[in-house]
Amino acid sequence: METSGKTALITGGSRGIGRAIVERLLADGHQVINLDRDPPSAPAGNEVFEQVDLADEARSRAVLSALAERWSITRLVNNAGVVRPGPIEEASTEDLQAVVAVNVASSIRCVQAVLPAMKAARYGRIVNISSRAALGKPLRTVYSVTKAGLHGLTRTLALELGAHGITVNAVGPGPIATELFDQANPPDAPATKRIIESIPVRRMGTPDDVAHAVAMLLDDRSGFITGQVLYVCGGMTVGLGHDA
């Protein structure tokens, strides 16, 4: 087993917020393992990429087991997520199962895979990527249920694992200018302008904003921060309804 002491596992690290997190951790000197369905467009030199559909339990367990045998992983970022938007009348059991499989179940599997190494080291950092949708968002019933579930997972694991030197926190991004967001919300569109006007700092967030928060929570010096949800939202979640 390779025990560099700074090995981080991240899910969904090939694009968007996940890619920014990978690049930040590499810049900070981590060995980074990226689990994703698709490879990154420009793999980094010190990045290990494993192609896996995290909704596939058998395949993902096999990959995680092999990685845990090779690496002493002491940092985990559960970033992979899927969305199936729609009104509550159209939410199906299949939708719920599909979103839970990636957003919640795969996060639990990843924690289970890295815990032996973290407990052996008496040190670990786990960050779950949530969303402001956990506080409620129209047409996101299934998605918001899973992200709120990550909050419960975060708080429960913080209580269970704190005595082992393992911290568990969540980061909840607000509106972030990723490629997918820009495709759905053109920068000059009136709806996009309304979103920006609703953000106290009057700008969209960037993937790097989220990566900075994640890097802080993964830092050695963050050992007294656990069980918390940090919203990276430009203040949007502070004043929900303040203009009503």
Predicted segments, located by residue:
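Active-site helix of classical SDR
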Residues: 111, 146, 154
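Substrate-binding pocket helix/loop in short-chain dehydrogenase/reductase
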Residues: 87-88, 95-100, 191, 195
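Alpha-helical segment proximal to the catalytic Tyr-Lys
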Residues: 116, 159-163, 223
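Conserved NAD(P)H cofactor-binding loop of Rossmann-fold oxidoreductase domains
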Residues: 79-84, 235
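Active-site loop-to-helix junction immediately N-terminal to the catalytic Tyr of the SDR YXXXK motif
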Residues: 91, 132, 137-145, 156, ...
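Short C-terminal tail/terminal secondary-structure segment
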Residues: 226-244
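Short, flexible catalytic-loop segment of classical short-chain dehydrogenase/reductase
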Residues: 172-183, 232
